[in-house]
UniProtKB/Swiss-Prot annotation:
It catalyses: [pyruvate, water dikinase] + ADP = [pyruvate, water dikinase]-phosphate + AMP + H(+); [pyruvate, water dikinase]-phosphate + phosphate + H(+) = [pyruvate, water dikinase] + diphosphate. The keyword Kinase applies. Keywords: Kinase, Nucleotide-binding, Serine/threonine-protein kinase, Transferase. Belongs to the pyruvate, phosphate/water dikinase regulatory protein family. PSRP subfamily. The keyword NADP does not apply. Signal peptide: none annotated. Bifunctional serine/threonine kinase and phosphorylase involved in the regulation of the phosphoenolpyruvate synthase (PEPS) by catalyzing its phosphorylation/dephosphorylation. It is an enzyme of class 2 (transferase). It comes from Halorhodospira halophila (strain DSM 244 / SL1). GO terms for molecular function: ADP binding; ATP binding; phosphotransferase activity, phosphate group as acceptor; protein serine/threonine kinase activity. This is Putative phosphoenolpyruvate synthase regulatory protein.
């Protein structure tokens, strides 16, 4: 027997939607969970296989497994509905029917539309923004900063790269990022590469203790990871942000999604997708 509650995200496509919604709901409860995603459950046979996997994994548990579903096909979903061994939460059943009544229009019941290539132009924007973020990651090149919607600035390991990539993929934002070096932190002026793009700058900072922990995992017992060095770099970076009037955000306890959404909001960026 176990106190851990098993949670499964079951979908007829990638499972991203079921996972995102289900995880958001579960974070509202102080319970220990073991989570798993079962994607591409698009036939009754696959649904039965998924059900066998779920019930087998939970056979010794005190409570039935919780299953979040975004399956569209009624026949496939029926396999899960008929089971007495799971607690099923179907997102589409919860929201689609009320929306159909409100909008007075039947839904299309199209599988995978939220994460498929429904619009070629949107897909192209995401790919172009991703390429831009990759080419302008970690100060690799400053050549096309003029195209950037935002340039994230901060010390090493302060979340710049994942935030840049998420902004590109999720919102189609052209995000570059610039790492503050020792020379940049010693100087009393803005780095030369950033001077003409001041309006696009957005700073990311982090608690020195957390930075020390992250860097120690990457380079243990190095000067780079020393707490004193982390404290110095964070203090100098924040002093630069204040001196130069650069808006900045403490990302210590924030997820990548929260960081990106906050940058969008505070910097008044226009999302392309």
């Amino acid at each position: 027997m176990t106190d851990v509650r098993r949670v499964f995200f079951v979908s007829d496509r990638t499972g991203i939607t079921a996972e995102a919604l289900g995880h958001s709901l579960m974070t509202q409860f102080s319970v220990t969970t073991e989570q798993a995603t079962i994607p591409f459950v698009d036939t009754a046979e696959r649904a039965r296989a998924a059900l066998r996997r779920i019930t087998a994994a939970s056979a010794e548990d005190d409570h039935p497994p919780i299953v979040f579903s975004t399956i569209i096909d009624p026949e496939v979903l029926a396999v899960l509905r008929e089971s007495e061994h799971i607690v099923l939460f179907d997102f589409f059943d919860t929201f689609i029917a009320p929306l159909e009544r409100e909008l007075e229009v039947p839904s299309n019941h199209v599988i995978g539309r939220s994460h498929g290539i429904a619009d070629d132009s949107t897909y192209d924007v995401r790919i172009d923004a991703m390429n831009f973020a990759l080419h302008h990651d970690d100060g690799a090149t400053h050549q096309h900063y003029g195209r950037a919607d935002v340039i994230l600035v901060g010390v090493s390991r302060s979340g710049k790269t994942p935030a840049s990539l998420y902004l590109a993929l999720q919102f189609g934002v052209y995000a570059a990022n610039y790492p503050l070096t020792d020379d940049d932190l010693i100087a009393t002026r803005l780095p030369r590469a950033l001077v003409s793009h001041r309006a696009k700058l957005f700073g990311l900072t982090i608690d020195p203790d957390r930075l020390h922990q992250i860097r120690s995992e990457r380079r243990p017992n190095s000067r780079y990871a020393e707490l004193r060095q982390c404290e110095y770099e964070v203090a100098r970076a924040e002093a630069m942000f204040r001196r130069e009037g650069i808006p900045y955000l403490d990302i210590t306890t924030m997820s990548i999604e929260e960081i990106s959404s906050t940058v969008i909001h505070q910097h008044a960026l226009t999302r392309r997708v």
